[in-house]
Amino acid sequence: MLAGVLLLYPLDVYVMRPGNAYNVSEYVTVQDGDEDDEGSFSLMTVTLSKASPLMYVYAKFKDYYELISMNQVRQDEEDDNEYNIRQAKLMTDSQFNALYVAFSRTDLEYKVTFNGVYVLNIITGGAADGILEPGDEIVEIEGEHIDSQAMFAQRIVEMRDQGQYDIELVINRDDELFTEVVTLKEIPNSKGKVGLGVVFSESKSITTDPHVNIDIGSIGGPSAGLMFTLEILNQLVDEDITKGY
């Protein structure tokens, strides 16, 4: 029993340690792209996990291991699911930015689509609690397509100031659209501020010609944006920008 506690009981502390290096070309494929380059770009990772009592002690004395407090990793009221969703969104954004920069530099065709706002976190006891879920995309507000994060926030403020607290939203959840009415209310611990009670970010997608596929598996976080960009560029142009390294 004691051994199980020492090995498995999660503490409110994280251990960060070195991960692995990956050849980015194994995860990025440009349609009809240049493939005869001699060098490669590498994606470096770190591993972040909750510490058990035994791992906590081990990390204290192990080179290149670092103990990190919970509030350095998690946002306020963020649970495990919300944390994982935020990390996945950061990786999606990293890939979007890499495609945008690479195609902008090469003057090849691309199109950016604003999909709506992406729900990262639901504040417990807030207006959206029990209605919205982390990972939802809000695509319309009161019949209007959401074309920017600023537009969405401004519409919420305008409706609140006009005394309209019942707000109709169209939600995309797992590629299924549905409508919900959320009633604005005071956000807990906000000193009287009224709103939806969600943390959100922009949801954008990009289509390119030629098509690019990025499949990084379970790696999350804001990693590898520069390496993705360089690898995409390297496959788009004839030049070997790795210079053989």
Predicted region positions:
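PDZ/PDZ-like peptide-tail recognition elements
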Residues: 15-35, 41-51, 70-123, 181, ...
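Hydrophobic membrane-insertion alpha-helices, especially the h-region
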Residues: 1-10
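Short, solvent-exposed loop/turn elements at domain surfaces
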Residues: 53-57
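PDZ-domain C-terminal substructure recognizer with occasional recognition of PDZ-binding tails
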Residues: 106, 153-200
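Hydrophobic beta-strand core residues of beta-sandwich domains
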Residues: 122, 132, 146, 159-161
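Helix-boundary/low-complexity linker signature
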Residues: 64-66
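Terminal peptide-recognition signature
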Residues: 103, 128, 135-138, 169, ...
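Conserved PDZ fold ligand-binding element
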Residues: 128-151
